[in-house]
Regions:
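A domain-level signal for the mature, folded cores of soluble proteins
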Residues: 22-39
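Extracellular secreted precursors and ectodomains with disulfide-bonded cysteine-rich loops/domains
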Residues: 10, 80, 140-141
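Sec-dependent N-terminal signal peptides
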Residues: 1-7
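C-terminal region of N-terminal signal peptides and the immediate post-cleavage residues
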Residues: 7-26
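Glycine-anchored, exposed beta-strand/edge motif detector
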Residues: 100-105, 110, 122-128, 137-139
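C-terminal partner/receptor-binding element of secreted or periplasmic proteins
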Residues: 124-161
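Predominantly extracellular/secreted and cell-surface proteins with exposed
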Residues: 36-115
Length: 161
């Protein structure tokens, strides 16, 4: 399952949206930085497709976390519930609709919130993310997260309108 999901995310190159108005589309891989302790160095693949303004936004997100050996560590899919776009930065919040975590069998994060922010910097995109589970703080509707990690592979396209 992991390889096909990852291939689909990387193939998504951030092409233009068919809808008008604010949007973010694309996919890419980040490498978890040192602040993630034992998970540092793991690749995480993000796909984000959203359009609209505020809580009238619609879209989907897909996150795949692989371990350092390339095995599937976690996978989450959900719906975007809010989108804010300012210049080349898009902040989306969403709700997890399906998830699987290797180290937490039986735990349910379905219904919990996610915040993802993308800075579209051409070939040097950056990403920030926060997941509302495993002791992390609650995510407010339409929250944003400072992009803190470079996108190593892939591309996101942010459109302000």
């Amino acid at each position: 399952m992991g390889a096909s999901v990852v291939a689909g995310i990387i193939a998504c190159s951030g092409g233009a949206s068919a809808s008008s108005g604010p949007s973010v589309h694309g996919g890419g891989m980040v490498t978890l930085p040192a602040q993630f302790d034992d998970l540092a160095g793991d690749p995480v693949y993000f796909q984000l497709q959203a359009h609209g303004v505020g809580e009238a936004a619609a879209g989907r997100f897909n996150v795949v976390h692989l371990d350092d050996a390339g095995g599937l560590y976690a996978h989450a899919v959900g719906d975007v519930t809010c989108l804010s776009v300012v210049g080349g930065v898009a902040s989306a919040t969403g709700i997890i609709r399906h998830a699987w975590f290797r180290d937490f069998p039986g735990s349910s994060v379905v219904g919990m919130a996610v915040a993802i922010t993308v800075a579209d910097n051409g070939s040097e995109d950056a990403l920030g993310f926060h997941f509302e589970f495993f002791g992390e703080p609650t995510i407010a509707p339409c929250a944003d997260v400072t992009p803190f990690v470079a996108v190593d592979r892939g591309n996101f396209a942010v459109r302000s309108g």
